[in-house]
């Protein structure tokens, strides 16, 4: 089975590409959503988060994202600590997803690795067995990168990314700060030994679909 990572800097549109893959009935694990589920359900992870960020970081449904975001954007060492806490749990969940029985019952686009085996690739007859993981910054999680055969990088012009973030409700300054914080984090050279493919997403759905279908054709 081929294991492919989908990544891209903030505002590039990796989630849109993941959505298109789900529409084609591919199995895609949303790593960001999985992390939120772990924040909510994993007792051990919640304890580690509280030990470092304080009990105030926890909520009944997960964590106080605003509090944590303020810490990690102001302090690079806090971001590194967060990654060291979270990534081992996420890596285990992704491993379960990749190794789940392809014929097991589940929902193909679920972020829950316990039920992520899904319904297969019925709408893509001829495409070899493949599963996708969508994540923001694979380069900061070497253990995840090691699992992957290919990495598809979704990119967009910086002005387009800035506009998308502002449309989500961020101030222009905050959006620019977040873009700067991730600058270079999805560069192809950060993934030596992996087949790299780039999908440009400037907002034209038909062009994104065309690029995606070309990549899927190679998998047949």
Task: Describe each PLM feature range.
Residues 6:
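Hydrophobic anchor at the beta1->P-loop junction of P-loop NTPases
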Residues 10:
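The conserved Walker
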Residues 15:
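Walker A/P-loop
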Residues 27, 33, 150, 195-197:
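Well-ordered beta-strand positions
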Residues 33-106, 123-129:
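ATP-dependent small-molecule kinase phosphotransfer cores
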Residues 95-99, 126-127, 131-164:
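ATP-dependent NMP and nucleoside kinases share a basic, alpha-helical "lid"
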Residues 140-146, 166-219:
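Small-molecule kinase domains that catalyze NTP-dependent phosphoryl transfer to phosphate-bearing small molecules
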């Amino acid at each position: 089975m081929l294991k492919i990572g989908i990544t891209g800097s903030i505002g590039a549109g990796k989630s849109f590409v993941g959505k298109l893959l789900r529409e084609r009935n591919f199995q895609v694990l949303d790593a960001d959503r999985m992390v939120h589920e772990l924040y909510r359900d994993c007792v051990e992870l919640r304890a580690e988060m509280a030990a470092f960020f304080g009990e105030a970081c926890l909520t009944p449904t997960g964590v106080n994202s605003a509090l944590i975001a303020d810490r990690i954007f102001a302090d690079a060492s806090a971001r590194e600590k967060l990654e060291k806490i979270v990534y081992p749990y996420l890596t285990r969940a992704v491993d379960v997803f990749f190794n789940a029985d392809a014929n097991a019952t589940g929902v193909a686009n679920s972020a829950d690795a316990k039920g992520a085996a899904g319904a297969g690739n019925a709408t893509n007859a001829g495409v070899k067995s493949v599963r996708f993981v969508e994540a923001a910054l694979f380069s900061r999680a070497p253990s995840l990168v090691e699992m992957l055969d290919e990495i598809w990088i979704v990119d967009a012009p910086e002005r387009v990314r800035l506009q998308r973030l502002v449309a989500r409700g961020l101030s222009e300054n905050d959006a620019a700060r977040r873009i700067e914080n991730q600058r270079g984090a999805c560069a192809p050279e950060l993934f030596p030994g992996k087949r790299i493919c780039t999908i440009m997403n400037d907002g034209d759905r038909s062009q994104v679909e065309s690029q995606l279908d070309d990549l899927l054709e190679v998998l047949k």
